[in-house]
Amino acid sequence: MGMMQEFKEFAIKGNVIDLAVGVIIGAAFSKIVDSVVGDLIMPVVGAVIGKLDFSNMFVVLRSVPPGIPTTLDALKKAGVPVFAYGNFITVAVNFAILAFIIFLMVKQINRLKRREVVKPTTAPAEDIMLLREIRDSLKKQA
């Protein structure tokens, strides 16, 4: 079998296609979670804490040179070391929500798989049972 034929069989198998679909859906789903965190959850958390914009929460680790604005972007461009923890908080909340949703999805999939495996086996048909009895009877006579 040639390499191209092997690759074709590999690429057409369900697992590769399932993986590709999963990656595409995951990328789109990640954008939804980013929006939920950035647009819905973090503003509520910010309103409770008193700061609405977490991206500008930081601590300057060294003195700021004169004439440099004290915004995070300006300090980073000037090479001033800053401990930018606000963006980390947003990313951590984003990760926690995404991980929880994936956990719920995997839990549901596993529950459905268990339900499929436990299907009761049906008893053989009456004519099959009769044929088996005849077969067993013939074996005993022989």
UniProtKB/Swiss-Prot annotation:
Transmembrane segments: 10-30, 86-106
Subunit annotation: Homopentamer.
Organism: Polaromonas naphthalenivorans (strain CJ2)
Annotated localization: Cell inner membrane
Name listed for the protein in its UniProt record: Large-conductance mechanosensitive channel
KW Lyase (keyword) present: no
UniProt keywords, alphabetically: Cell inner membrane, Cell membrane, Ion channel, Ion transport, Membrane, Transmembrane, Transmembrane helix, Transport
InterPro entries: Mechanosensitive_channel_CS, MS_channel, MSC/AndL, MscL_channel
Record GO cellular component, one term: plasma membrane
Gene name of the record: mscL
HAMAP family with a match to the protein in the record: MscL
Pfam families named among the record's database cross-references: MscL
Mode of membrane association: Multi-pass membrane protein
Family: Belongs to the MscL family.
Any coiled-coil regions, as ranges: none
A molecular function GO annotation: mechanosensitive monoatomic ion channel activity
Function statement: Channel that opens in response to stretch forces in the membrane lipid bilayer. May participate in the regulation of osmotic pressure changes within the cell.
Record Gene3D superfamilies: Large-conductance mechanosensitive channel, MscL, domain 1
